[in-house]
């Protein structure tokens, strides 16, 4: 009986010796990967990219958040540059495209209707309406326009704001982003940043 008790005690000690390193390894990995790695990565990103890590937020003169440079939103009134149409109503919680194929007659009819509306609003020929002003982006939240799509809105915005067209064209040019690393994508205008510049210009007058 005594020998059996000693054997059982030794077996329990061996089990404990086997489990203890596994538990310590699991706890250490959890601490390292779940806490220290995340905290270190977050701190590094905030130090290196303070604006982007907070969502590229746009603020007014009082510091109030008015939007994000990454997410398009509608602007009411003719004194603003308008972004692309959105199947999601510019709602980040419902980001999506229309899922209509190019062969869908409903898509062709919608684009034709939008083209006529933009042409009348901007006082240009339908053939001069840039495609991105009448087509939706894949996620419905794209804040960018082609330079041509921004330029066709200059006359309207300048008239409403009492600015000269050359002055406004210079503002558009200043907010035109080049190709990514000079290779990827196309030149584009961030409508959110451009409209923020309009607010700052109006405040400075």
Enumerate the predicted regions with their spans.
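Flexible, solvent-exposed loop/hinge segments and secondary-structure transition points
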Residues: 2-17, 21, 25-26, 33-34, ...
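Extracytoplasmic/periplasmic C-terminal soluble domains
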Residues: 156-205
